[in-house]
Amino acid sequence: MSIASYVLVAFRRHTDTAIEAGFKYLILGSVATLVMLLGIASIYRETGGIALPVTATTAGPWLRIGRACFLVGLGLKSGIVPLHTWLPDAYGRAPSSVSALLAGIVSKSTLYVLFRISLGLGMQAETLGLILLLFSFLNMTVGNALALLQRYTKRLLAYSSVAQTGYVMFAVGLGLRYGRPAAIRAGFFLLLAHAVLKALAFLSKGVCHYHRDVTLTRELRGTAAQIPLVAVTFAVALIGLAGIPPLAGFAAKWWILTESLPAPDGWVAAGIVIFLVNSVLALGYYLPLIVRLFDNSGAEG
């Protein structure tokens, strides 16, 4: 899947930016794979095998190194801050249909594998939960802050994916550290909802680009006048991603918040505040996009 993704990102080979983004994605993806291979070698040195049932019941320094390697490698492939630098370029410069595939399937499946492999390798649920909570704060804050600064629509959507990954990590980390399985289910529900909604957003953006050569966020004005159905589908996707009722994005975030209360300690209390603040910050770039879609002052004729 990774090799196909590298090629698809650079599919528009007649443009230097696509080649650059594809090459950057290839290099960083290869580094992630090499780090995970180093992890496999470390685990094999400790246990004499790579079967998960064996590694889950074994302890040792090389096994800890192996777990760390898998966390770093899969974290890079999932776009976890500060290993996310490839993601805006890959999402922003690939064809919109490829961006939808990357956001909807590739990154999400890698994040799921990170959760499963880390536990399968015997990492304590409480330890993994704390790691996910800490990095979720970074993802939410960095993703939303950088999205607010973007002028290019696809890069804005890319950085919002970084933030959405943080919401999922917060829910799963909460569930693992404090033994709240419903929080984990809420996180996976948000993961699925985001995959569908973000894919819809990228596909809608692709149709806008095809019909109107839209690249910048301000160029979305007049979309409803010229291609009203696309404006509606794009708006639905953005409303869901913003967590506005009654769509799945709101339901998932509400579920996560209800499972985080009452806060068992300061980490979760801080996480709830960061979660809410970032959800409000996200409205600062989602709502202007929705308004521009239905602002006909930019329509021709």
Residue ranges and their predicted role:
Residues 1-2:
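Hydrophobic alpha-helical hairpins/lids featuring a short glycine-rich hinge
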Residues 5-254, 258-283, 291-293, 297:
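Hydrophobic transmembrane alpha-helices and their helix-loop junctions in integral membrane proteins
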Residues 299-301:
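Short, intrinsically disordered, charge-balanced linker/junction segments flanking boundaries
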